[in-house]
Protein backbone atom coordinates (compact mmCIF):
# COMPACT_ATOMS: atom_id res chain seq x y z
CA UNK A 1 0.00 0.00 0.00
CA UNK A 2 2.74 2.43 0.97
CA UNK A 3 4.70 1.49 -2.17
CA UNK A 4 1.72 2.23 -4.40
CA UNK A 5 1.16 5.60 -2.78
CA UNK A 6 4.83 6.43 -3.20
CA UNK A 7 4.72 5.51 -6.90
CA UNK A 8 1.64 7.69 -7.38
CA UNK A 9 3.29 10.58 -5.58
CA UNK A 10 6.44 10.25 -7.68
CA UNK A 11 4.37 10.04 -10.88
CA UNK A 12 2.41 13.12 -9.87
CA UNK A 13 5.63 15.03 -9.13
CA UNK A 14 7.15 13.93 -12.45
CA UNK A 15 4.12 15.03 -14.46
CA UNK A 16 3.95 18.31 -12.58
CA UNK A 17 7.62 18.99 -13.20
CA UNK A 18 7.30 18.17 -16.90
CA UNK A 19 4.30 20.45 -17.28
CA UNK A 20 6.18 23.30 -15.66
CA UNK A 21 8.90 23.31 -18.34
CA UNK A 22 6.66 22.91 -21.37
CA UNK A 23 6.54 26.09 -23.47
CA UNK A 24 3.22 27.86 -23.19
CA UNK A 25 1.08 28.17 -26.30
CA UNK A 26 1.54 31.72 -27.54
CA UNK A 27 -0.10 31.28 -30.92
CA UNK A 28 -3.15 33.08 -32.26
CA UNK A 29 -4.51 31.11 -35.20
CA UNK A 30 -8.21 31.79 -34.73
CA UNK A 31 -10.24 34.85 -33.88
CA UNK A 32 -10.53 35.91 -30.24
CA UNK A 33 -14.09 35.95 -28.96
CA UNK A 34 -16.20 38.78 -30.33
CA UNK A 35 -13.87 39.79 -33.16
CA UNK A 36 -14.92 40.27 -36.75
CA UNK A 37 -12.69 38.37 -39.17
CA UNK A 38 -10.84 39.21 -42.36
CA UNK A 39 -9.61 36.65 -44.87
CA UNK A 40 -10.72 34.28 -47.60
CA UNK A 41 -13.19 32.61 -45.24
CA UNK A 42 -13.75 35.58 -42.93
CA UNK A 43 -16.58 38.03 -42.45
CA UNK A 44 -14.79 40.43 -44.81
CA UNK A 45 -12.27 39.99 -47.59
CA UNK A 46 -10.47 43.28 -46.91
CA UNK A 47 -9.39 45.07 -43.77
CA UNK A 48 -10.89 48.28 -45.12
CA UNK A 49 -14.34 46.68 -45.32
CA UNK A 50 -14.04 45.47 -41.72
CA UNK A 51 -13.11 48.97 -40.55
CA UNK A 52 -15.99 50.53 -42.48
CA UNK A 53 -18.42 48.09 -40.90
CA UNK A 54 -17.54 49.40 -37.43
CA UNK A 55 -19.45 52.57 -38.28
CA UNK A 56 -19.94 55.23 -35.63
CA UNK A 57 -20.06 52.86 -32.66
CA UNK A 58 -18.09 53.75 -29.55
CA UNK A 59 -17.99 50.21 -28.15
CA UNK A 60 -14.77 48.25 -27.79
CA UNK A 61 -14.12 46.36 -31.02
CA UNK A 62 -11.60 43.91 -32.43
CA UNK A 63 -10.68 42.60 -35.86
CA UNK A 64 -8.83 39.34 -36.48
CA UNK A 65 -6.89 39.15 -39.75
CA UNK A 66 -6.04 35.77 -41.25
CA UNK A 67 -2.68 35.06 -42.87
CA UNK A 68 -2.06 36.85 -46.13
CA UNK A 69 -0.74 39.94 -47.87
CA UNK A 70 -3.31 42.73 -48.02
CA UNK A 71 -2.61 45.40 -50.62
CA UNK A 72 -4.58 48.21 -49.01
CA UNK A 73 -4.23 51.77 -47.81
CA UNK A 74 -6.06 52.26 -44.52
CA UNK A 75 -7.23 55.17 -42.41
CA UNK A 76 -8.28 54.19 -38.89
CA UNK A 77 -10.57 56.67 -37.17
CA UNK A 78 -12.80 54.69 -34.80
CA UNK A 79 -14.42 56.27 -31.75
CA UNK A 80 -14.00 53.26 -29.45
CA UNK A 81 -11.06 51.16 -28.31
CA UNK A 82 -9.99 49.12 -31.35
CA UNK A 83 -7.71 46.08 -31.39
CA UNK A 84 -6.27 44.55 -34.57
CA UNK A 85 -4.92 41.00 -34.31
CA UNK A 86 -2.78 39.28 -36.94
CA UNK A 87 -2.62 35.51 -37.25
CA UNK A 88 0.58 34.06 -35.81
CA UNK A 89 2.02 30.96 -34.21
CA UNK A 90 3.88 33.06 -31.63
CA UNK A 91 2.36 36.28 -30.33
CA UNK A 92 5.54 37.33 -28.53
CA UNK A 93 7.65 37.93 -31.64
CA UNK A 94 7.29 39.60 -35.03
CA UNK A 95 9.31 36.78 -36.61
CA UNK A 96 6.28 34.50 -36.97
CA UNK A 97 3.90 37.15 -38.31
CA UNK A 98 1.83 36.04 -41.29
CA UNK A 99 -0.17 39.22 -41.99
CA UNK A 100 1.27 42.03 -44.11
CA UNK A 101 -0.48 45.25 -45.11
CA UNK A 102 1.36 46.91 -47.98
CA UNK A 103 0.97 49.84 -50.34
CA UNK A 104 3.39 51.67 -52.61
CA UNK A 105 3.29 55.43 -53.03
CA UNK A 106 5.66 58.28 -52.22
CA UNK A 107 4.82 61.45 -50.36
CA UNK A 108 5.30 63.65 -53.47
CA UNK A 109 2.93 61.42 -55.42
CA UNK A 110 0.37 61.33 -52.60
CA UNK A 111 0.55 65.04 -51.83
CA UNK A 112 1.66 64.72 -48.20
CA UNK A 113 3.40 62.45 -45.75
CA UNK A 114 0.10 61.37 -44.19
CA UNK A 115 -1.47 60.59 -47.55
CA UNK A 116 1.43 58.32 -48.48
CA UNK A 117 0.99 56.13 -45.40
CA UNK A 118 -0.03 52.52 -45.82
CA UNK A 119 -1.80 52.78 -42.45
CA UNK A 120 -2.83 56.12 -40.92
CA UNK A 121 -4.14 55.93 -37.35
CA UNK A 122 -6.11 59.02 -36.35
CA UNK A 123 -8.06 57.71 -33.35
CA UNK A 124 -6.98 57.09 -29.77
CA UNK A 125 -6.85 53.72 -28.04
CA UNK A 126 -5.76 51.50 -30.91
CA UNK A 127 -3.79 48.32 -30.17
CA UNK A 128 -2.08 46.37 -32.97
CA UNK A 129 -0.69 42.84 -32.59
CA UNK A 130 1.50 40.81 -34.95
CA UNK A 131 0.93 42.78 -38.13
CA UNK A 132 3.53 43.85 -40.69
CA UNK A 133 3.02 47.27 -42.30
CA UNK A 134 5.10 48.26 -45.32
CA UNK A 135 5.47 50.97 -47.91
CA UNK A 136 7.16 49.41 -50.91
CA UNK A 137 8.29 52.62 -52.61
CA UNK A 138 11.97 52.29 -51.69
CA UNK A 139 14.62 54.99 -52.03
CA UNK A 140 14.27 58.33 -53.79
CA UNK A 141 11.51 60.02 -51.80
CA UNK A 142 9.70 60.02 -48.49
CA UNK A 143 7.21 57.16 -48.28
CA UNK A 144 5.49 56.36 -44.98
CA UNK A 145 4.46 52.91 -43.77
CA UNK A 146 2.64 54.03 -40.59
CA UNK A 147 1.33 57.37 -39.40
CA UNK A 148 0.58 57.09 -35.67
CA UNK A 149 -1.24 60.35 -34.97
CA UNK A 150 -3.27 59.68 -31.81
CA UNK A 151 -2.98 58.98 -28.10
CA UNK A 152 -2.54 55.69 -26.26
CA UNK A 153 -1.46 53.59 -29.22
CA UNK A 154 0.18 50.21 -28.64
CA UNK A 155 2.09 48.06 -31.13
CA UNK A 156 3.04 44.55 -30.09
CA UNK A 157 5.36 42.31 -32.14
CA UNK A 158 4.78 44.26 -35.34
CA UNK A 159 7.02 45.10 -38.32
CA UNK A 160 7.30 48.45 -40.08
CA UNK A 161 9.25 48.54 -43.33
CA UNK A 162 10.23 51.38 -45.65
CA UNK A 163 13.26 53.43 -46.62
CA UNK A 164 12.78 57.14 -45.89
CA UNK A 165 10.27 58.14 -43.19
CA UNK A 166 9.05 54.63 -42.39
CA UNK A 167 7.39 55.26 -39.03
CA UNK A 168 5.76 58.64 -38.45
CA UNK A 169 5.29 58.66 -34.67
CA UNK A 170 3.50 61.96 -35.04
CA UNK A 171 1.63 62.80 -31.83
CA UNK A 172 0.27 61.39 -28.58
CA UNK A 173 1.65 58.64 -26.35
CA UNK A 174 2.80 55.48 -28.12
CA UNK A 175 4.27 52.13 -27.08
CA UNK A 176 6.23 49.73 -29.30
CA UNK A 177 7.56 46.41 -28.03
CA UNK A 178 9.11 43.27 -29.55
CA UNK A 179 8.83 44.92 -32.95
CA UNK A 180 11.03 45.54 -36.00
CA UNK A 181 11.44 48.95 -37.64
CA UNK A 182 13.40 49.16 -40.90
CA UNK A 183 14.54 52.09 -43.01
CA UNK A 184 17.48 54.32 -43.88
CA UNK A 185 16.68 58.02 -43.61
CA UNK A 186 14.77 59.54 -40.68
CA UNK A 187 12.85 56.31 -40.37
CA UNK A 188 11.48 57.02 -36.90
CA UNK A 189 10.26 60.61 -36.91
CA UNK A 190 7.65 63.02 -35.54
CA UNK A 191 6.63 64.53 -32.21
CA UNK A 192 4.93 61.69 -30.36
CA UNK A 193 6.09 60.69 -26.90
CA UNK A 194 7.09 57.17 -27.85
CA UNK A 195 8.68 54.26 -26.00
CA UNK A 196 10.46 51.54 -28.02
CA UNK A 197 11.34 48.41 -26.04
CA UNK A 198 13.12 45.24 -27.12
CA UNK A 199 12.82 46.27 -30.76
CA UNK A 200 15.10 45.48 -33.70
CA UNK A 201 15.87 48.81 -35.37
CA UNK A 202 17.29 47.95 -38.78
CA UNK A 203 19.06 50.29 -41.19
CA UNK A 204 18.88 49.26 -44.86
CA UNK A 205 20.97 52.20 -46.08
CA UNK A 206 23.17 55.03 -44.86
CA UNK A 207 21.33 57.74 -42.96
CA UNK A 208 19.69 58.69 -39.68
CA UNK A 209 17.50 56.59 -37.43
CA UNK A 210 15.47 59.31 -35.71
CA UNK A 211 14.23 62.75 -36.75
CA UNK A 212 12.31 64.01 -33.76
CA UNK A 213 10.28 67.23 -34.12
CA UNK A 214 9.80 68.63 -30.63
CA UNK A 215 9.67 72.45 -30.88
CA UNK A 216 8.92 73.97 -27.45
CA UNK A 217 10.20 73.54 -23.91
CA UNK A 218 6.64 72.89 -22.72
CA UNK A 219 6.34 69.89 -25.06
CA UNK A 220 6.73 66.76 -22.90
CA UNK A 221 7.53 64.42 -25.80
CA UNK A 222 10.44 61.97 -25.82
CA UNK A 223 11.67 59.20 -28.05
CA UNK A 224 13.02 56.54 -25.66
CA UNK A 225 14.80 53.61 -27.28
CA UNK A 226 15.15 51.07 -24.49
CA UNK A 227 16.80 47.62 -24.60
CA UNK A 228 16.75 47.67 -28.41
CA UNK A 229 19.11 46.17 -30.97
CA UNK A 230 20.36 48.52 -33.68
CA UNK A 231 21.61 46.62 -36.72
CA UNK A 232 22.19 46.67 -40.46
CA UNK A 233 19.88 44.83 -42.81
CA UNK A 234 21.19 41.49 -43.98
CA UNK A 235 23.92 41.78 -46.61
CA UNK A 236 24.36 45.56 -46.25
CA UNK A 237 27.72 47.00 -45.12
CA UNK A 238 27.00 50.25 -43.28
CA UNK A 239 30.06 50.55 -41.06
CA UNK A 240 30.14 54.12 -39.73
CA UNK A 241 27.32 55.22 -42.06
CA UNK A 242 24.40 55.49 -39.64
CA UNK A 243 23.63 58.27 -37.16
CA UNK A 244 21.41 57.87 -34.12
CA UNK A 245 19.39 60.88 -35.17
CA UNK A 246 19.11 64.43 -36.39
CA UNK A 247 16.67 67.14 -35.27
CA UNK A 248 13.72 67.70 -37.60
CA UNK A 249 12.73 70.53 -35.26
CA UNK A 250 14.91 72.57 -32.93
CA UNK A 251 14.25 70.86 -29.56
CA UNK A 252 14.31 67.20 -30.53
CA UNK A 253 14.65 64.93 -27.48
CA UNK A 254 15.84 61.33 -27.82
CA UNK A 255 17.50 58.80 -25.54
CA UNK A 256 19.06 55.43 -26.30
CA UNK A 257 19.37 53.38 -23.11
CA UNK A 258 20.45 49.80 -22.41
CA UNK A 259 20.61 49.21 -26.16
CA UNK A 260 23.13 47.55 -28.48
CA UNK A 261 24.83 50.01 -30.83
CA UNK A 262 27.05 48.20 -33.38
CA UNK A 263 29.80 49.54 -35.63
CA UNK A 264 27.33 50.93 -38.15
CA UNK A 265 26.93 53.91 -35.79
CA UNK A 266 29.15 56.82 -36.80
CA UNK A 267 31.54 57.90 -34.04
CA UNK A 268 29.92 61.36 -33.98
CA UNK A 269 26.62 59.68 -33.13
CA UNK A 270 24.31 62.54 -33.97
CA UNK A 271 23.88 64.94 -36.89
CA UNK A 272 22.43 68.39 -37.58
CA UNK A 273 19.37 69.30 -39.65
CA UNK A 274 17.08 72.09 -38.36
CA UNK A 275 18.70 75.54 -38.34
CA UNK A 276 19.45 76.78 -34.83
CA UNK A 277 18.62 73.44 -33.26
CA UNK A 278 19.60 72.74 -29.66
CA UNK A 279 18.49 69.12 -29.39
CA UNK A 280 18.57 67.05 -26.23
CA UNK A 281 20.31 63.82 -27.17
CA UNK A 282 21.18 61.28 -24.49
CA UNK A 283 22.84 57.88 -24.26
CA UNK A 284 22.79 55.73 -21.14
CA UNK A 285 24.39 52.32 -20.48
CA UNK A 286 24.50 51.14 -24.07
CA UNK A 287 26.86 48.44 -25.36
CA UNK A 288 28.41 47.44 -28.66
CA UNK A 289 31.13 48.73 -30.97
CA UNK A 290 29.20 51.92 -31.68
CA UNK A 291 28.44 52.84 -28.07
CA UNK A 292 31.66 54.76 -27.33
CA UNK A 293 30.59 58.37 -26.71
CA UNK A 294 34.04 60.00 -26.59
CA UNK A 295 33.68 61.59 -30.06
CA UNK A 296 29.98 62.35 -29.88
CA UNK A 297 28.50 65.64 -31.08
CA UNK A 298 25.33 67.27 -29.74
CA UNK A 299 25.31 64.86 -26.78
CA UNK A 300 23.88 65.93 -23.41
CA UNK A 301 24.66 64.19 -20.13
CA UNK A 302 22.16 62.22 -18.10
CA UNK A 303 22.66 60.37 -14.81
CA UNK A 304 19.75 57.92 -14.89
CA UNK A 305 17.55 56.19 -17.44
CA UNK A 306 14.29 57.73 -18.53
CA UNK A 307 11.22 55.95 -17.15
CA UNK A 308 8.03 54.84 -18.81
CA UNK A 309 6.12 57.22 -16.58
CA UNK A 310 8.11 60.14 -17.98
CA UNK A 311 7.55 59.13 -21.60
CA UNK A 312 4.08 57.58 -21.49
CA UNK A 313 2.46 59.23 -18.48
CA UNK A 314 1.69 58.00 -14.99
CA UNK A 315 -1.40 56.16 -16.27
CA UNK A 316 0.39 54.06 -18.88
CA UNK A 317 -0.48 50.78 -17.13
CA UNK A 318 -4.13 51.50 -17.91
CA UNK A 319 -3.62 51.19 -21.67
CA UNK A 320 -0.33 49.34 -22.25
CA UNK A 321 -0.53 45.53 -22.50
CA UNK A 322 1.73 44.53 -19.62
CA UNK A 323 1.87 40.86 -20.65
CA UNK A 324 4.67 41.75 -23.08
Curated annotation (Swiss-Prot):
A GO BP annotation: cell wall modification
Catalytic function, reaction form: [(1->4)-alpha-D-galacturonosyl methyl ester](n) + n H2O = [(1->4)-alpha-D-galacturonosyl](n) + n methanol + n H(+)
Glycosylation sites: 285
A GO term for molecular function: pectinesterase activity
Active site: 165 (proton donor), 186 (nucleophile)
Site description Transition state stabilizer, residues in chain: 164
N-terminal signal peptide: 1-19
Name of protein: Probable pectinesterase A
Amino acid sequence: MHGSLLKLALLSFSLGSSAAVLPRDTGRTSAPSGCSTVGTSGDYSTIGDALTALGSSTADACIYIAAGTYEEQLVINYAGHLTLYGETTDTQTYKQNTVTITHTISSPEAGSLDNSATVNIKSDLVSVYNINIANGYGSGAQAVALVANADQLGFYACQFTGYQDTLYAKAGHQYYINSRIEGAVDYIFGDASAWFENCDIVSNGAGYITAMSRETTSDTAWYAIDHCNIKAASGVDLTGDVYLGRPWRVLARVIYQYSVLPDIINAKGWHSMADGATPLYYEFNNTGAGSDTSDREYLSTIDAPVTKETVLGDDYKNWVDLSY
